[in-house]
């Protein structure tokens, strides 16, 4: 937010200067241009975070497409137990996918934005992605819950739920984004409240209108534990790697400053220091990329081990996924 704060301060100074000089109209135009630049910068950072936020929801298409025919087929055979089992498997698979993605975006929001969008202001874009990461869990779970309700014949209920959630989103954006202390951060907060409300209503409806309702504790507990531990591992690895990279950068800068003390004129000294600073900057960018990718890779391994160790998934669950049988054989389920 440093650049944006400077722009706002410049707008205030321009307005004050215009008032003292009598050029209020010119100052107002300058303030308008500066504020428009700030708003575009804010929306640009938010749009970049949205691009990453939308990726996990696209993975839900395969699950939602398989839930409706599987549940409808079981109900047509009057197999209510089978329909309930398929519904529970769909929710469990979704939780196993959505929880780690949401936790990963929440924990690694800033380094991911720095890796993919280095030109953006990471102090602004990072927290936006982290907040949107929490909304990812609610969106993915809501999509599958809607499919379950539709498979049981309750076609209109998901629409009503979405209308209620949309009202919450509009209310939050209108009132919270306008708060100076919240600003653009109110937009992802609106996503959390909107889709969190939709998911809560969907789960209540599933429990009320569907026979043999799924046991939510059995479905969500193990994915939540595995995701929480995975997030802790990613946070620890990235934190340790960042400290190592900062130590190396500090040593490189000290070496550059030491070389600048040698005789050779002021120009040579400044040149040596400039080369050292560029070396530190390159090391920072490369180090962030390596540390971020390494933390994500270790998090994936930790999560996979925990899912198998906790028995968080079964062969019936994998049957809803593409190549589920091969994955089950690989995991020896």
Residue locations for each model-derived region?
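C-terminal transmembrane helix end/exit motif
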Residues: 1, 192-243, 301-319
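Interfacial segments at transmembrane-helix termini and the short loops linking adjacent helices
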Residues: 10-13, 32-44, 105-139, 250-251
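Alpha-helical transmembrane segments of polytopic membrane transporters and translocases
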Residues: 30-32, 42-60, 91-96
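Helix-loop junctions and terminal segments of transmembrane helices
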Residues: 49, 60-79, 84-87, 91, ...
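Hydrophobic alpha-helical transmembrane segments of multipass membrane transporters and ion channels
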Residues: 52, 92-100, 134-138, 225-233
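Short runs within selected transmembrane alpha-helices of multi-pass transporters and secretion channels
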Residues: 61-64, 127-153, 157-177, 184-207, ...
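Short alpha-helical transmembrane segments in multi-pass integral membrane proteins
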Residues: 86-107, 184-209, 224, 301
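Membrane-proximal transmembrane or re-entrant/amphipathic helices at the cytosolic face
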Residues: 211, 238-333
């Amino acid at each position: 937010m440093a650049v944006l704060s400077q722009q706002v301060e410049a707008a205030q100074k321009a307005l004050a200067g215009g008032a003292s000089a009598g050029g209020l109209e010119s100052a107002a135009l300058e303030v308008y241009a500066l504020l428009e630049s700030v708003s575009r910068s804010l929306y640009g950072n938010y749009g970049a975070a949205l691009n990453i936020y939308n990726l996990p929801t696209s993975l839900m298409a395969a699950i939602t497409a398989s839930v409706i025919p599987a549940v409808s087929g079981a109900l047509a055979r009057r197999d209510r137990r089978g329909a309930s089992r398929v519904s529970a498997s769909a929710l469990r698979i979704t939780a196993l996918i959505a929880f780690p993605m949401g936790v990963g975006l929440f924990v690694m929001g800033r380094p991911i934005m720095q890796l993919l969008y280095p030109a953006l202001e990471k102090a602004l874009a990072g927290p936006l992605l982290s907040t949107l990461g929490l909304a990812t869990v609610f969106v993915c779970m809501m999509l599958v819950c809607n499919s379950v309700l539709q498979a049981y014949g309750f076609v209109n209920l998901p629409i009503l739920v979405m209308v209620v959630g949309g009202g919450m989103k509009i209310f939050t954006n209108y009132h919270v984004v306008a708060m100076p202390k919240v600003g653009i951060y109110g937009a992802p907060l609106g996503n959390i409240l909107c889709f969190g409300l939709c998911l809560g209503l969907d789960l209540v409806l599933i429990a009320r209108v569907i026979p043999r309702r799924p046991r939510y504790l059995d479905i969500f507990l193990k994915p939540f534990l595995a995701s929480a531990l995975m997030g802790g591992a990613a946070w620890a690895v990235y934190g340790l790697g960042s400290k190592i990279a900062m130590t190396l950068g500090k040593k490189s800068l000290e070496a550059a400053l030491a070389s600048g003390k040698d005789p050779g004129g002021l120009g040579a000294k400044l040149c040596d220091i400039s080369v050292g600073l560029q070396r530190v900057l390159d090391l920072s960018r490369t180090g962030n990329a390596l540390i971020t990718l390494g933390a994500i890779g270790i998090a994936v391994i930790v999560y996979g081990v925990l899912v198998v160790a906790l028995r968080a998934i079964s062969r019936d669950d994998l049957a809803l996924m593409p190549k589920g049988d091969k994955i089950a054989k690989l995991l020896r389920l």
